[in-house]
Amino acid sequence: MDPASSPNPASASFAPAGFPSDTDEDGVSPGYIVPEIIVTEPAWRRHIPHADRLIRRVARAAGSTADCVVLSCDRDVRRLNARHRGKDKPTNVLTFEPVGMPGAEGGEIVLALGVVLREAKAARKRPVHHLAHLLVHGVLHLHGHDHHHAGDARRMEAEEARIMRSLGMPNPWKRS
């Protein structure tokens, strides 16, 4: 995907950081989309050094359809959140379906480093575990999951916990 020509809001102004392989070590398509990883906030590498590996692990475990994961900063996520959701504040994760193709595979997940770190600290969680949870959360949104109603929220939380368990990570909904 060429972010400069992308109609999607998150990658439209960002330069690519690299293109991971779309096959596994045996040359077989893995059954999930290996997302392009764009790092627009270099501090991600300091706080979560192997975020790229984690993104690929989560993509595999969650059956990701995301074309792109953007590791961004609070300022840029705040702008996106204001423009697309009318909320003038940063949020932890935003997801964008493919433009003009509701229900189609693909889409983007954008994360704000400052929010992710503050939330992890407040919840006494390791930042890598919180990032994994937010990636799973974003993938589930791209799969059509929602949490606007209590029943939907419970189902989404249960699926998040199941995927996190498959990754060998703690249930994000249990207090430690």
Curated annotation (Swiss-Prot):
One of its GO terms (biological process) is rRNA processing. Its cofactor is Zn(2+). The keyword Acyltransferase does not apply. One of its GO terms (cellular component) is cytoplasm. Keywords: Cytoplasm, Endonuclease, Hydrolase, Metal-binding, Nuclease, Ribosome biogenesis, rRNA processing, Zinc. Binds 1 zinc ion. It comes from the Bacteria. Residues 1-21 have a biased composition (Low complexity). Belongs to the endoribonuclease YbeY family. This is Endoribonuclease YbeY. It comes from Granulibacter bethesdensis (strain ATCC BAA-1260 / CGDNIH1). The lineage of its organism: Bacteria, Pseudomonadati, Pseudomonadota, Alphaproteobacteria, Acetobacterales.
